A protein has these predicted regions:
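C-lobe/activation-segment region of protein kinase-like
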Residues: 88-153, 157
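Short alpha-helical scaffold element within the canonical Hanks-type protein kinase domain
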Residues: 51-55
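AlphaC helix of the protein kinase catalytic domain
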Residues: 37-47
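A short beta-strand motif that forms the metal-chelation/ATP-contact edge
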Residues: 26-31, 86-92
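Short, glycine/acidic-enriched loop or turn micro-motifs at the edges of active sites
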Residues: 33, 77, 94
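Intrinsically disordered, low-complexity segments enriched in glycine and mixed charged residues
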Residues: 157, 162-166
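Hydrophobic residue at the +6 position relative to the catalytic HRD Asp in the kinase catalytic loop
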Residues: 75-82
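Conserved ATP-binding subdomain of kinase catalytic cores across diverse folds
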Residues: 1-38, 57-68, 72, 151-154, ...
Length: 209
């Protein structure tokens, strides 16, 4: 395990085995009863100070990965679990190793990818987060705010392009319905028989004079 080899905290792997037909694998991980992902913690945070503290935790964790030459391909708050005031790394299968420490260009692009998932109004916190990052990873030169902001904007554009592509097909988040006479996309969280009925025949729901 790339994380354990570098003494980075991660839930213990208790058992793993291939699935039938060897199309995948099943993993049984250590259960941390009080564990919450940083996404869950962020949703429960009441004050801006609490949210900033959680972003700082994630930033330092990402910087630590980079210092050890590790890069999370799809880096986001769900990759980190907070348990007993300690941060655990998750989703080790989506981590690549790039040598003893991550090259500066890759490191800052990866950090920008993380920052790009948040709303634009949160960009005012980037300066403080860059300071937190550099405290944890001094293998890179001190990051320049304008350069990181440029990378964040580029990452946001790429995220938007990828999101638009996903709208053309069904995913775990969205359902896509396409036929000769209709095209509909909706969030699976709002799925219901009533919505299905509306999509199949919307004219029945139009009030006529």
């Amino acid at each position: 395990n790339l994380l354990r080899e570098r003494n980075l905290r991660t839930p213990s792997l208790l058992h793993n085995a291939p699935t039938a037909g060897n199309h995948g694998a099943a993993l049984i991980m250590q259960y941390l009863s009080d564990g919450k992902t940083l996404t869950e913690c962020m949703q429960n945070a009441v004050t801006s100070q609490e949210r900033h503290s959680l972003l700082s935790l994630a930033t330092r964790s990402i910087a630590t990965c980079h210092r050890f030459g590790l890069r999370q391909i799809d880096v986001h708050m769900d990759n980190f679990l907070l348990s007993d005031k300690e941060v655990y790394y998750l989703d080790g299968g989506q981590i690549q190793v790039q040598g003893e420490s991550l090259e500066e260009e890759l490191a800052y692009d990866n950090f920008a990818l993380f920052l790009a998932q948040f709303k634009v109004e949160n960009d005012e916190a980037i300066g403080d987060l860059l300071h937190e990052y550099h405290l944890e990873n001094k293998t890179c030169s001190a990051p320049v705010y304008a350069d990181i902001l440029r990378r964040v904007k580029r990452a946001r554009n790429l995220r938007l392009i990828n999101y638009e592509k996903k709208l053309l097909r069904s995913t775990t988040a969205n359902r896509n319905i396409r036929s000769l006479d209709k095209f509909a996309v909706y969030d699976r969280e709002i799925h219901s028989p009533l919505l299905e009925d509306f999509i199949s025949d919307p004219n029945r729901y139009i009030v006529k004079d």
